Amino acid sequence: ISAIGFIVGIKRLSHPRTARSGNFLASLGMLVAIIATLTSGADFDWKLIGLGVGIGSILGVMIAVRVQMTQMPQMVAIFNGLGGAASAFVASAAYISGSDSSYIIMCMSLFIGTLTFSGSFIAFGKLQGFISGRAITFTGQQAMNALIFGSIIALLIAHNLSLLPNDTIFYTITVLALMLGIGLTIPIGGADM
C-alpha cells in the first residue's frame, strides 16, 4: 500500500494541478510504511526513535523557515543526498555489525545510497553556484561510466564466486559508486537540474 502511495504520489507531482494531491499521497505512503515498520513486532529503542524524530523535526522547521522558494531545488538536492547517505550508512552499519541481511542487498543499498549522495551534492553545487553550472563533458565519459558500473557488477559476481574478501568488495563499491554519481551528474547543466 505504501509503495502504491509513493508511486502514484510521485506521478502526480509531475503536474502543477495534481502536485498537492501527489504530495499528500506520497506522505500518506510514508506514514503507512512507518506505522507498518513500528508495529511489525521488532524490538525498537523508542528513545532513539523519539530523539531522531525530535532532532529531524527541529532541523526541518529551521530549514523550512529560512529557505526561500527560489532555493527549493538546492534544498531538494541536499535532502536527496542526505537520504542517499542515510541508505549508505544503514548498509554500512549492517555490514560492520555482521547482520544476517543478504550481502548483495547491503552492497546494492550502499551502491544506490552512495551514488545518490555524490550525484545530489554535485547537483546542489551546480544549482548553488559553488561549481560551474555548465555541462562538463569529455571524450570517453560514457565509456568511463559504463566501465565503473561494469566493475561494480564484476565485484558482486566476484563475491558470489568467493574471489575477493568481502571487505575489499564493500569498500571498493563505495569508492566506485561515489565516482559514478559524480560521473553521471557532471554532464548535466545546472539549468537542466
Question: What are the language-model segments listed below?
Answer:
Residues 1-3, 23, 40-58, 102-117, ...:
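Structural signature of hydrophobic alpha-helical transmembrane segments
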Residues 30-31, 145-153:
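Core segments of transmembrane alpha-helices
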Residues 1-34, 40:
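N-terminal, positively charged regions that mediate nucleic acid binding
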Residues 34-38, 61-62, 153-157, 181-185:
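Alpha-helical transmembrane segments of multipass membrane proteins
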Residues 57-62, 81-96, 106-122:
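Mid-bilayer segments of alpha-helical transmembrane spans in multi-pass integral membrane proteins
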Residues 5-18, 57-76, 120-135, 180-190:
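C-terminal ends of transmembrane helices
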Residues 18-29, 49-52, 71-83, 135-145, ...:
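Cytoplasmic-side transmembrane-helix entry/capping segments in multi-pass membrane proteins
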Residues 37-50, 62-73, 88-101, 126, ...:
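Transmembrane alpha-helix boundary signature
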